[in-house]
């Protein structure tokens, strides 16, 4: 082989090697581009999924917030309704207390005065029947003292007939009286609309039969009926 043939053969080998290198480089480039596109697509899909999850999370948070807000508004409305109902019921109770106070007011022209005397006697008898003690201590308002003392014999006699026992010893406490009637001058002071409180001599058994206590008991017992009558259904106490 002469130099010319050798040169041609070398050039052919160089072209072959260069062509093969270019093909390999092209394959690598195509493969890299495909891998890049796949990786890019995966990143895009991952970001899309992340955005969707974030949106769903925010949407759920909004729904929960809406439900909480609605529940709070509903509860606030219910509280307002219940408060309004309580205000009406309490206003009725206050009016009943005012009317009850008229029963125990003294005065010649007070047509309730005679009724109050008999009411005091009934309250005393009721306490005696509950206590069933041979000796009791009685407390009343200072302004009711004369009426109470005038009724003791009748009350004791009626108790004896009903309980079939001997007359008890009734000691009227003239040192400590029940609070006076409510006054506009001091509306927050302790007050009593009338009635009596009887206790055993040792003070262990007490029967509170004031008009205030009776009103409280009657009102508490009748409260479901009052609410049903006013609001059409039994409300919360």
Swiss-Prot record:
Record's bilayer topology term: Peripheral membrane protein
Function field: Subunit of the peripheral V1 complex of vacuolar ATPase essential for assembly or catalytic function. V-ATPase is responsible for acidifying a variety of intracellular compartments in eukaryotic cells.
Keywords: Acetylation, Coiled coil, Hydrogen ion transport, Ion transport, Membrane, Transport, Vacuole
Organism expressing this protein natively: Arabidopsis thaliana
Protein name, entry field: V-type proton ATPase subunit E3
Quaternary structure and interacting proteins, as annotated: V-ATPase is a heteromultimeric enzyme composed of a peripheral catalytic V1 complex (components A to H) attached to an integral membrane V0 proton pore complex (components: a, c, c'', d and e).
DNA repair recorded as keyword: no
Residue numbers of N-acetylmethionine PTMs: 1
């Amino acid at each position: 082989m002469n130099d010319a043939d050798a040169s041609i053969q070398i050039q052919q080998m160089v072209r072959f090697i260069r062509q093969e290198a270019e093909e390999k480089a092209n394959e690598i480039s195509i493969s890299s581009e495909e891998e890049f596109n796949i990786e890019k697509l995966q990143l895009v899909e991952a970001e899309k999924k992340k955005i969707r999850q974030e949106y769903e999370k925010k949407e759920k948070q909004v729904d929960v917030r809406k439900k909480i807000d609605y529940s709070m508004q509903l509860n606030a409305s219910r509280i307002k309704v219940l408060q309004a109902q309580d205000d009406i019921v309490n206003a009725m109770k206050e009016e009943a207390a005012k009317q009850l106070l008229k029963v125990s007011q003294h005065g010649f022209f007070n047509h309730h005065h005679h009724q109050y005397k008999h009411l005091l006697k009934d309250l005393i008898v009721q306490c005696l029947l509950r206590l069933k003690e041979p000796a009791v201590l009685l407390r009343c308002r200072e302004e009711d003292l004369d009426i109470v003392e005038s009724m003791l014999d009748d009350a004791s006699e009626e108790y004896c007939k009903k309980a079939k026992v001997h007359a008890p010893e009734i000691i009227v406490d003239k040192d400590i009286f029940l609070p006076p009637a409510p006054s506009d001058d001091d509306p927050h002071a302790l007050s009593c609309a009338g009635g009596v409180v009887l206790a055993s001599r040792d003070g262990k058994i007490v029967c509170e039969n004031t008009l205030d206590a009776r009103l409280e008991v009657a009102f508490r017992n009748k409260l479901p009926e009052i609410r049903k009558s006013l609001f059409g259904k039994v409300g919360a106490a």
